[in-house]
Regions:
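Cysteine-based protein phosphatase catalytic domain of the PTP/DSP
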Residues: 1-94, 98, 106, 113-154
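Intrinsically disordered, low-complexity regulatory segments in eukaryotic proteins
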Residues: 160-162
Length: 162
């Protein structure tokens, strides 16, 4: 299961790079994947790369898997990409190298903001579907900070006149 992608929400999948390799094209097509978010470190760019640019729409993010990497700045972009795909009837695969830390953090952030969930609840929700997730401590801290950020934005939106 760790080397395969799992459907976290209808149309939103999380997995390792191996689930997006050339040999997995039939599986991607079977699941109806139309968009792929590829999260990798700069040093991984030679072997973790978009394999099907002619078939899928890609968002490629070069993000280090270390506790001091600022991932919050990428959340709005990834949410817009996922929302755009799902609203047009598409399906999205979010992958990193192993599908355990970076890519899981982005899926958790998406679920938190989309459904107004707290970090702990969103983490548990994703882990029920992809058991092997294990975020680095810095990403956990940033997701906990992000909870306060998006909840404050939500409060402001609710208080604003139409």
């Amino acid at each position: 299961m760790r080397r395969e992608m799992q459907e976290i929400l209808p149309g939103l999948f999380l997995g390792p790079y191996s689930s997006a390799m050339k040999s997995k094209l039939p599986i991607l097509q079977k699941h109806g994947i139309t968009h792929i978010i590829c999260i990798r470190q700069n040093i991984e760019a030679n072997f973790i790369k978009p394999n099907f640019q002619q078939l899928f729409r890609y968002l490629v993010l070069d993000i280090a898997d270390n506790p001091v990497e600022n991932i919050i700045r990428f959340f709005p972009m990834t949410k817009e990409f996922i929302d755009g795909s799902l609203q047009s009837g598409g399906k999205v695969l979010v992958h990193g190298n192993a599908g355990i830390s970076r890519s899981a953090a982005f899926v958790i952030a998406y679920i938190m903001e989309t459904f107004g969930m707290k970090y702990r609840d969103a983490f548990a929700y994703v882990q029920e579907r992809r058991f092997c997730i294990n975020l680095n401590a810095g990403f956990v801290h940033q997701l906990q900070e992000y909870e306060a950020i998006y909840l404050a934005e939500l409060t402001i939106q609710m208080m604003s006149p139409l």
